[in-house]
Amino acid sequence: MSVVAMLEGADAADRATTQTAVGIAQRLNVPVRGLCALPDPTATLIVMSTPEATGLAANATRDIAALQDQVIARAKASFDDITSSGSHGLTCTFSHVVDIAERAGANAATLADAVVFPHSVQKVADPLSLSFEYVLMEARLPVVMAGTTPLQAGPVIVAWDGSNGAARAVRFHLSIVKAFGEVIIAQNEKDLGKDQQRDAANPAALEEWLDTHNVKHKRMPIEGEVASSLLALAKGSGASVIVAGAYGHSRIGERLFGGTTQRLLDAPERPALALAR
């Protein structure tokens, strides 16, 4: 098993992603893999019928390949700079995969302990935005979004409402939850009334499940708007990660009108997010 850092060739984003990946991997004692996925330049070619057009296509392919080489070089440099010290005691490798980032991300998330995306993927224009959305929304595999600051030694916050998304998030990310050692169960009881309540929404159900995995836990109720309350709790407790179900309502609706997931993704300051849908 390993922790995979999804890289895009942007120095600041790749450094933060790698730092988060290394921080998680240290606690799990597993290798780190830096992954830069770019499609085959020739895959975008349109069949041309004239010699002139064919020549133009060949030139375009070479230009795209040259640009990709630059992206790969930047991604590798950022990854190597963070991991080269060796003080973390982990095996760290960089790889370039010829594939679309959506498929490469889903393949990585299938069996990895964690797949870490940069904080910037909440922006539609980010190179890895489609990959992040595909892995989370279509493949329905777990993802980690790097925080705006390095991982701390604090607890993990689990945003618990008994929903399928929350359950999948905590089950998918169990290894991370156990590695950080302590869980804060956060719940806004008033917010539960917005949807049909489930018996599993009772924090006691999660507490019993955590007990079977020997994970320490405590409850800390929150009030008001969920996302801002979670962020305030994370800041006050020094939490390293927020584990949460993602997009319990329409993703488009959340983007247009706001929602807990979208507000967490858009927050200018926050810890890492471990998400599942």
Task: Indicate where each model-derived feature is located.
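Glycine/threonine-rich flexible loop motifs
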Residues: 123-129, 251-256
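Short secondary-structure boundary segments
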Residues: 36, 119, 187, 245-247, ...
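Charged helix-capping and loop-helix junction motifs
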Residues: 129-132, 200-203, 256-261
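A structural preference for short, hydrophobic beta-strand core positions in alpha/beta folds
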Residues: 34, 92-96, 145, 185, ...
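A short acidic, glycine-rich active-site loop
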Residues: 55-73
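Short, flexible loop segments at boundaries between secondary-structure elements
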Residues: 266-277
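Small/aliphatic-rich secondary-structure junction motif
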Residues: 1-59, 138-141, 151-220
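Structural beta-alpha unit
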Residues: 13, 39-42, 66, 73, ...
